[in-house]
Regions:
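ABC ATPase "signature
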Residues: 166-167, 175, 246
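Conserved ABC ATPase "signature" region
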Residues: 8-11, 48, 52, 59-77, ...
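Conserved signature/switch motifs of ABC ATPase nucleotide-binding domains
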Residues: 25, 80-83, 101
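Conserved ABC ATPase signature
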Residues: 19, 81-85, 89
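Short coil-to-helix segment of the ABC ATPase nucleotide-binding domain corresponding to the Q-loop/switch region
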Residues: 41-48
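Conserved ABC ATPase "signature" C-loop
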Residues: 160-162
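The conserved cystathionine-beta-synthase
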Residues: 207-242, 247-266
Length: 266
């Protein structure tokens, strides 16, 4: 292996075992694919386990753990045991446990892959909502490209242990840098994933023939529905009440066609 893992300005690969344990205990929390809850402990005790490891009593961590259990939708479940909960509810406990630890970094290793599709979507939406509020560093590992495109601010694609491409997800989808990435993204529903901000013309000058206003974060799929399929339309692109661009429907249609590596954007 090679490379560095920089955290707070330090390469953690240089840490000894004791320092790694301290970092893991105080600076990083984890959400596991198989939940990893203690079956003989209540939901509340599982959520507060990081505090207990540090020698704090249930009385001291109960309020913090309850706050995060409530936040992830588990109000009134603190006295239940993991076996009494569904898979989705157990993973909510796992997220509450990570949040109760109050670490700056949350590592989520295939955290939602064991859940059925509907619950998985709910958990993805919950994570997006929490991240918008908390602004933590979340490292999310997944084999599901749709999930990665939905959740990631910065996407890193690996093959055989090496980084093949990394960038903002929209950029990777529009600009695959080699045949592997091109094949990797070929089956993605581009209209559902791509956002207006990725295909708009950046300008604060309104078009002369404006058909309406759209938000910079709207999906192309939603714009197609609004336009009724009229490829001659132009829209003002707004962000927080201010124009940030113009969307030409012809550019939207062009973005739906996958680009091969090396092709320049028009």
């Amino acid at each position: 292996t090679s490379g560095e893992v920089i955290m707070n300005g330090e390469n953690i690969l240089d840490y000894n075992e004791r320092r790694l344990r301290e970092m893991r205990k105080h600076e990083m929390s984890m959400v596991f694919q198989k939940f990893a809850l203690l079956p003989h402990r209540t939901v509340l005790e599982n959520a507060g386990i990081s505090w207990e490891i540090e020698g704090k009593t249930r009385k001291k961590y109960a309020a913090e753990a309850t706050k995060w259990l409530d936040r992830v939708g588990l109000q009134g479940q603190g006295d239940q045991y993991p076996a009494q909960l569904s898979g989705g509810m157990q993973q909510r406990v796992g997220i509450a446990r990570a949040l109760t630890s109050n670490s700056d970094v949350m590592l989520m290793d295939e955290a939602f892959s064991a859940l059925d599709p509907l619950i998985r979507t709910d958990m993805q939406d919950l994570l997006i909502e929490l991240q918008a509020e908390l602004h933590k560093t979340v490292i999310f590992i997944t084999h599901d490209l749709d999930e990665a495109l939905k959740l990631a601010d910065h996407l890193v694609i690996l093959k055989d242990g090496f980084i093949v491409q990394q960038s903002e997800p929209q950029h990777i989808l529009l600009n695959p840098n080699d045949p592997y990435i091109e094949a990797f993204v070929s089956d993605i529903n581009r209209a559902r994933v791509l956002r207006v901000r990725s295909v708009m013309e950046k300008t604060d000058v309104p078009p002369s023939d404006v058909a309406g206003e759209v938000d910079h974060d709207d999906t192309l799929e939603s714009i197609i529905a609004v336009s009724g399929g009229d490829t001659t339309n132009n829209y003002r692109v707004m962000r927080e009440g201010r124009q940030v661009g113009v969307l030409h429907m012809r550019d939207l249609v062009r973005a739906l066609v996958p680009r091969h590596p090396g092709e320049a954007a028009e």
